[in-house]
Amino acid sequence: MAVFVANESGASDVDEVRLAALARFVLDAMKVNPLAELSVMLVEPKAMTDLHVRYMGEEGPTDVLSFPQDDAFDASWSESVDDDPTTLLGDVVLCPDVARRQAEQAGHSFDRELSLLCTHGILHLLGYDHAEPDEEREMWKVQSQLLASWDGADGADGADGARGAADGAADGGEGRRGDQGRRGDQGRGGGAGEPPAAPAR
């Protein structure tokens, strides 16, 4: 499972290696097809504002946008994937400046906020949403379980624990939608400059 992290934000305090490890951890825990590829992009506020206005119709920078790439791709894990082409699951776009502000307001670390936002963005790519109360409860529950398992494993060997915690949701909980990528703080794109399709956040 390939995760590509591109830091175009100018932020020097982003632990890109840890962010990639977290993303792989979440994808593995959610039983995502190992041939899927994910792009995580970190952008400056102006770039995020442009995406936010263009794809969400809202002013100002946001914290995270998710852009699913291939709606026809089966993201679920399978034993027989040899004949499947490698396919891009989508892009998660993060804004470190906004994340840093939110971390201060929440009273936790910048790394913790980025982990939360990246996990949130990936769940949107997998069809989770929080437009309705029941969806929000399910998405927040899975998100919390994944982050707790990541914290316990420190990104090392805890994928089994996360997988167990998220099993019910990964198989289709209330928080998932048939269409991948609604609002939550995500969008869809091939890159920060030119993402294709409508985002979720």
From Swiss-Prot:
The keyword Zinc applies. Its cofactor is Zn(2+). Zn(2+) binds at H120, H124, H130. Its EC number is 3.1.-.-. GO terms for molecular function: metalloendopeptidase activity; RNA endonuclease activity; zinc ion binding. The keyword Oxidoreductase does not apply. GO terms for cellular component: cytoplasm. GO terms for biological process: rRNA processing. Disulfide bonds: none annotated. It is found in: Cytoplasm. Binds 1 zinc ion. Its main location: cytoplasm. Single strand-specific metallo-endoribonuclease involved in late-stage 70S ribosome quality control and in maturation of the 3' terminus of the 16S rRNA. NCBIfam families: rRNA maturation RNase YbeY. This is Endoribonuclease YbeY. The gene is ybeY.
